Swiss-Prot record:
InterPro entries: TPR-like_helical_dom_sf (IPR011990), TTC26 (IPR030511). This is Intraflagellar transport protein 56 homolog. It is found in: Cell projection, Cilium, Flagellum. GO terms for cellular component: ciliary basal body; ciliary base; intraciliary transport particle; intraciliary transport particle B; motile cilium. Belongs to the IFT56 family.
Length: 566
């Protein structure tokens, strides 16, 4: 998950001057700085004149100082100035709303609402209260202030922003496009539209829209950052970092970029490198930092740490629901907790069946996961097959797709997916080896399954693999490898089922050699196995005699047929 925001403030910007005209008055300098959005310069000028008690023409210093400080993201300074203004008799009550905006930016929503309500009834007050209601999840107030919005550009921009934050990206796009049709000079709205398409996973469309803005504003920090995020989704981390380098270079020369966002996204682009150093301080600064730290812990099998980070998070966005579902799935399996698994199923089903998500890749992954937990593998395959072209190199997808195929009897497809897995970590898992061996055996590739067993070290898992090998090979009449597996099992544990299994498999090999379906060499191997059983059970004459009888029949036939080992 990436942070696609990124506000900037101009640094050391040279003022634009018209040929033959030089502005010298402080008012002209201040006006020029404000028009160029060089709020750092404006703040510096105003603070100088304030501390030296010099007038700035007829302009009131404090209101403009607070305005400039707010827009350069020095909110604490802006708050101090507004408090000073409001302590004076006859102050403009609009400053209560301005101070409310400062509290809103700081995340102090109760204070923001208190200040806003002290101000006059106006469109700015409505917009501020509208955003506060959205941030505090007060649906009743949100509806009230929504109805008070007018068709002005400012009010409609607020509506678009709230749609965006609530995950209603298509509705936000509709608002922004309507404004663009009416007021084409608001070209920066293309960035907002591009951000919505990014959130909807339309990364190529997002880039196309974004380039409209970048053609005329190629040093926009927000646009560059969003472009790098799109490159990450479309290509890889290296391509994304190359785009972000443009922003880092601008930081050194032209802009003071919000370093937190750059640092956060670099961690993502570098696949979690330095995550434990960079992300924890950003948990309450960059919203995506918490989610990415959870992902880092999951990748490193630190399930408890991931759970602690996300357990109190009330999910709003689909990514939050999905991640919380995944963490609960891990905890549920580890603790055998039906409560956690129930939460997992509810969240996966909620996102996967949502109208806005059901036809997206994450939405279909959610439905596949939901049915996987229910062990409803036919439905799992419906969803996984629909998105398979997007995950041909994803080991986790190939693994789960292979399991679902094998569980529904599609063993050829299962073998194809499971053999495509490259991760050594996945290949070492008992579950993976079990499903792959079963797929090999069911596709008449029993030797491949036997080779997997031969590479295993002696353990409880290898014993279980032998049992699977013996039984599955017997079922599909791969009697030679069934005999080899039962032979090892019998030597490890002389249980009756292994003895009977070995006798049956050896007779099966004899029948197949007799019918020309199995090479003669296999029968000679079987004769050695039978001879070993005769010796192993010397203290149990009944069992020993059974093996000896089978061996005698085979030897007589071999002699009569003049069969020779190749």
């Amino acid at each position: 998950m990436l942070s696609t925001s990124g506000r900037v403030k101009r640094k050391n910007a040279a003022p634009l001057q018209k040929v033959g005209q030089t502005k010298t008055s402080v008012v002209d300098q201040l006006e020029e700085a404000l028009q160029q959005r060089d709020f750092s310069k404006a703040t510096t000028v105003l603070e100088f004149y304030k501390t030296t008690n010099q007038p700035v023409g007829d302009l009131p210093i404090n209101p403009w100082l607070a305005y400039s400080a707010f827009h350069m993201n020095d909110v604490s300074k802006a708050l101090d100035v507004y408090k000073e203004l409001l302590s004076l008799d006859g102050c403009d009550p609009m400053h209560y709303i301005h101070m409310g905006c400062c509290h809103f930016v700081n995340g102090s929503y109760a204070e923001a609402e208190e200040c806003a309500l002290k101000g006059p009834d106006c469109s700015l007050q409505t917009r501020l209260l509208f955003h506060i209601a959205q941030k505090t999840y007060d649906e009743d107030k949100l509806l009230v202030y929504h109805q008070k919005l007018k068709e002005t550009v400012e009010d409609q921009l607020s509506l678009g922003a709230v749609h965006f934050y609530r995950g209603h990206f298509q509705e936000a796009i509709d608002v922004y496009k309507r404004i663009l049709l009416e007021t084409r000079e608001y070209i920066a709205l293309n960035v907002y539209v591009a951000m919505c398409y990014y959130k909807m996973d339309y990364y190529d469309v997002s880039l196309e829209v974004l380039n409209v803005y970048l053609q005329s504003h190629n040093n926009s920090a927000t646009a560059i950052n969003l472009k790098s995020c799109n490159h990450y989704r479309l290509y890889n981390g290296k391509a994304a970092e190359a785009e972000l380098r443009v922003l880092i270079d601008l930081q050194r020369s032209t802009y003071n970029v919000e370093n937190d966002i750059v640092k956060h996204n670099l961690v993502v682009f570098r696949n979690g490198e330095d995550a434990l150093q960079v992300l924890p301080p950003l948990l309450n600064v960059v919203p995506e930092a918490r989610l990415n730290l959870v992902i880092y812990h999951l990748r490193h099998e630190q399930i408890e740490e991931a759970y602690e980070l996300i357990k109190d998070l009330e999910p709003v966005a689909s990514t939050e629901y999905i991640l919380k579902a995944v963490v609960n799935a891990f905890i549920g399996q580890k603790l055998d907790s039906e409560e956690h698994l129930k939460t997992t199923r509810e969240y996966f089903n909620l996102i996967g069946s949502a109208q806005s998500e059901c036809d997206t890749i994450p939405g279909r992954q959610c439905m596949a996961s939901y049915f996987f937990i229910l062990r409803d593998f036919p439905n799992v395959l419906i969803y996984l097959r629909s998105i398979k072209p997007y995950f041909l190199n994803d080991d986790t997808f190939l693994y789960l797709h292979g399991i679902a195929c094998a569980a529904t009897g599609s063993f050829a497809e299962a073998e194809e997916s499971l053999t495509a897995v490259r991760s050594e970590k996945v290949k070492a898992e008992f579950s993976y080896m079990s499903w792959l061996m079963r797929a090999h055996i069911m596709n008449k590739h029993a030797k491949r399954a036997w080779d997997i067993y031969l590479k295993m070290e002696t353990s409880a898992e290898s014993f279980n693999i032998l049992q699977l090998m013996a039984n599955d090979c017997y079922k599909v009449c791969a009697f030679y490898y069934a005999a080899k597996a039962f032979d090892v099992l019998e030597r490890l544990d002389s249980a009756p089922e292994y003895i009977e299994g070995k006798k049956g498999a050896c007779i099966g090999v004899f029948q197949q050699v007799f019918a020309g379906q199995e090479p003669a060499d296999s029968l000679f191997d079987v004769m050695k196995m039978l001879d070993m059983s005769v010796q192993q059970h010397a203290n149990d004459p009944k069992v020993s005699q059974q093996f000896e009888s089978i061996l005698k029949v085979i030897k007589d036939w071999v002699k009569e047929s003049k069969l020779k080992k190749k």
